[in-house]
Every structure is written in structure tokens, then in C-alpha cells.
Curated annotation (Swiss-Prot):
It is found in: Cytoplasm; Secreted; Cell surface. It catalyses: (2R)-2-phosphoglycerate = phosphoenolpyruvate + H2O. One of its GO terms (biological process) is glycolytic process. Binds a second Mg(2+) ion via substrate during catalysis. GO terms for molecular function: magnesium ion binding; phosphopyruvate hydratase activity. This is Enolase. The gene is eno. Catalyzes the reversible conversion of 2-phosphoglycerate (2-PG) into phosphoenolpyruvate (PEP). It is essential for the degradation of carbohydrates via glycolysis. Its cofactor is Mg(2+). Its EC number is 4.2.1.11. PROSITE patterns: ENOLASE. CDD domains: enolase (cd03313). GO terms for cellular component: cell surface; extracellular region; phosphopyruvate hydratase complex.
Length: 431
């Protein structure tokens, strides 16, 4: 039995210099799992709660000592002696003990760190890589694929101090034959984009997710400079590289209107903003749009799905917050056709796997995602491969908190070879 003998929680620092929770789970036989919780900037209102101390004298109120105390106290007491291989039971014990709908007693950051650390320790005790253990937990042993990356090379919105309203402009190296080649194409376009921006006298400082964060004349200009970079890098837009956007529209939804401050405070209704996006998809090969409307604008989302849903992938992030109850409602109402998967929106590995399964069973795609506040923890790489999710969103080609995930994917691809196909654009809904 992979019995848990010790659990340690500690406060560490994330990629934004804010504290987060790290957990260590020790098993009989000396096996250890180590995992850290990420943290978002543009968060959905229905996400599981990230517990912060609120003590302004430490880390400006962002300390996580309460969550760490939960790991070292009640959580440790509850899971010590339990079998780490029984992930569903470990997660259920913590969720039941917390006793709240949104994990506000211990914090999703505490529960998630222990959940992932337990999975890593269990994988070690079985003598297998984490992705292989995840595939077994998922009920799909031995079924793997390498995800198509969505690389966020221009950051706006809450991820950058610039005038760009749309939060992420991404490239997908769909012409690649392997994940490793996709990373190379992404890197070449990223570096070429720096040249394009410099030639225009624009900033090449990077945002939270490692993409450039220049001030631009409009949101469409972000697409134009990326298109120029793709061409200059020697690739064909639409064939070798496609585009994706995360609007994070909740962040610019004010009094029932979508207000683009970077475009002279232009205001749109749900229908108008849908057609604004539709026009962009006619000008550029955009194959995926995330959170194209506010998380509460379900009528608008239904309309957007009717207009765009058969042509492109419409991903719900703040809309669904990796929550099966909310996703189920979305599936029943025909809202969006894809879900963004973020561990810490729901707060445990078991619930994350349930959301991926529900999406796939309904014909929705699942995009595995980082958060804007990350650590060197690369678990999402193993999650993407182990669930054969097909797509991953883990930032740009800079900042080691982002690159850690790409490097882990490169290692996994090397280990699995033909057992983990890279399916490229075929993974994207509507393509």
C-alpha cells in the first residue's frame, strides 16, 4: 500500500513574486511528491476560493499562512495513513473536511497542492511517470497524445500594463509534425515578433505570461504584427501557424456593454461584440476564441455559439471555471463548444479529471491551462498528455515558469515516441 506517512505545507513564491502553497506528500518506502498551487489574475467569480491571509503587514496581505496551516494541521491529520493511489478518496476526504461549496475553509490552494503532491507520490511508488499514472486515474491507461500549444505571444488585459483590451493573442504551430517542432516554430515566431515590434519603435517588455506587452493602436493591430512576424519567420499564416485569442471579456464588461478602452472607449452589445470578433476571424485565421463575452452573459454566449460555433472553437474559462455543474448547464444550453481546464479553479485532481471527461463525452474539447501566476511546477504538461486532452495553453517562449511546461512536454514526447501522437489542428473544435 502507498500509505501516506507525512504531509508538509509551506509558503513559497510564484512567478509574480506573490506567495503560494507548496505541499510535500511522503509515502511508506520513501516516495515523495512535491506540488505547488498556481494563481490567476483575471479570475471567474465562481472559481473555488484561493485563501489569502489578508494581513497587510506580510506580503501586502497576500500571505498564505492560513492555507499552509490547513495543510500541516487538519488536512495532514485526515490523509495520513490513507492510500495515495486512491486519488478519488484522498480528494473526497479533503473536500468533505473543508465542508464548503467553494473550498473556502482551507482554500483551494491548500487542497490542490496536496491533491497533486499525492498523485506525484503515488506515481513514484508505482515506478511510473506522472502522465502514466494520470492516464490510469482517468480510466484511459496507455492512451496518450501530445497537445497542440496555444502560445500567448502578445499579452494585454489583466496580464500587462498596456492599452490592449483583449488579454491574449496566441499562435498555434499547426504545421508542426511533433511537439518539439511546434516549440521551435513558436520560438522562431516569438523572436521575430520582437524584431517587428522594435522596428515599429514598440516595447518588447513582457507580461505575466511571457508575451510582449506593447501599446498598440487597436486590438486588430496585435493580430497584424503577429501576422507580420509569422511571415518574416518564414511561415505561412493559416497553414503553418493559426491564431487564437482569449478576450477575457468579463474584464471589460461594464453596465451591460463591452467597452474597449484601447479603442477610444468603443462600447458594444453582446451581439455587436460577437460580430466584431466575427470580422476579425474573416481577416485572420483565428481558430479559437476564449471567453468572448462576460461569464454571466449566457444569452449572449448562446448567440455567439450560434454565429461562430460551427466555424471555430469557443472556449469557456471564466464561463465554466472547470466546474462540472456549470459545464453541464452549458452543454444542455448549447453554450460554447470547449472548456479551459485550470486545476485551481476547482481545486482537486479528481474534479479536474471529471470536467475533462464530461467535456469530451459531450463532444466539447478541453484545453489544459496554466494561470498567470505560476511556479516551476509542470504538472499540467503531464495532465495534458495523460488525459490525451489535445491542447495546452502555457504561455509564451520566455520566463522559466512558462518554459518549464514546454520542456517537460519535450521530455515526455521523447519518452513516449509514437505512443503519443501530435495531432495538430485536428484537436481544435470546428477545424
Amino acid at each position: 500500500m502507498s500509505k501516506i506517512v507525512k504531509v508538509i505545507g509551506r509558503e513559497i513564491i510564484d512567478s509574480r513574486g506573490n506567495p503560494t502553497v507548496e505541499a510535500e506528500v511522503h509515502l511508506e518506502g520513501g516516495f515523495v511528491g512535491l506540488a505547488a498551487a498556481p494563481s490567476g489574475a483575471s479570475t471567474g467569480s465562481r472559481e473555488a476560493l484561493e485563501l489569502r491571509d489578508g494581513d497587510k503587514s506580510r506580503f501586502l496581505g497576500k500571505g498564505v499562512l492560513k492555507a499552509v496551516a490547513a495543510v500541516n494541521g487538519p488536512i495532514a491529520q485526515a490523509v495520513i495513513g490513507k492510500d495515495a493511489k486512491d486519488q478519488a478518496n484522498i480528494d473526497k476526504i479533503m473536500i468533505d473536511l473543508d465542508g464548503t461549496e467553494n473550498k473556502s475553509q482551507f482554500g483551494a490552494n491548500a487542497i490542490l497542492a496536496v491533491s497533486l503532491a499525492a498523485a506525484k507520490a503515488a506515481a513514484a511508488s508505482k515506478g511510473m511517470p506522472l502522465y502514466e499514472h494520470i492516464a490510469e486515474l482517468n480510466g484511459t491507461p496507455g492512451k496518450f497524445s501530445m497537445p497542440l500549444p496555444m502560445m500567448n505571444i502578445i499579452n494585454g488585459g489583466e496580464h500587462a500594463d498596456n492599452n490592449v483590451d483583449i488579454q491574449e493573442f496566441m499562435i498555434q504551430p499547426v504545421g508542426a509534425k511533433t511537439l518539439k517542432e511546434a516549440v521551435r516554430i513558436g520560438s522562431e515566431v516569438f523572436h521575430t515578433l520582437a524584431k517587428v515590434l522594435k522596428a515599429k519603435g514598440m516595447s518588447t517588455a513582457v507580461g505575466d505570461e511571457g508575451g510582449y506587452a506593447p501599446n498598440l493602436g487597436s486590438n486588430a493591430e496585435a493580430l497584424a504584427v503577429i501576422a507580420e512576424a509569422v511571415k518574416q519567420a518564414g511561415y505561412e499564416l493559416g497553414k503553418d501557424v493559426t491564431l487564437a485569442m482569449d478576450c477575457a471579456a468579463s474584464e471589460f464588461y461594464k453596465d451591460g456593454k463591452y467597452v474597449l478602452a484601447g479603442e477610444g472607449n468603443k462600447a458594444f452589445t453582446s451581439e455587436e461584440f460577437t460580430h466584431f470578433l466575427e470580422d476579425l476571424t474573416k481577416q485572420y485565421p483565428i481558430v479559437s476564441i476564449e471567453d468572448g463575452l462576460d461569464e454571466s452573459d449566457w444569452a449572449g454566449f448562446k448567440y455567439q455559439t450560434e454565429v461562430l460555433g460551427d466555424k471555430i472553437q469557443l472556449v469557456g474559462d471564466d464561463l465554466f471555471v472547470t466546474n462540472t455543474k456549470i459545464l453541464k448547464e452549458g452543454i444542455e444550453k448549447g453554450v460554447a463548444n470547449s472548456i479551459l481546464i485550470k486545476f485551481n479553479q476547482i481545486g482537486s485532481l479528481t474534479e479536474t479529471l471529471a470536467a475533462i471527461k464530461m467535456a469530451k463525452d459531450a463532444g466539447y474539447t478541453a484545453v489544459i491551462s496554466h494561470r498567470s501566476g505560476e511556479t516551476e511546477d509542470a504538472t499540467i504538461a503531464d495532465l495534458a498528455v495523460g488525459t490525451a486532452a489535445g491542447q495546452i495553453k502555457t504561455g509564451s517562449m520566455s520566463r522559466s515558469d512558462r518554459v518549464a511546461k514546454y520542456n517537460q512536454l519535450i521530455r515526455i514526447e521523447e519518452a513516449l515516441g509514437d505512443r503519443a501522437p501530435f495531432n495538430g489542428l485536428k484537436e481544435v473544435k470546428g477545424q
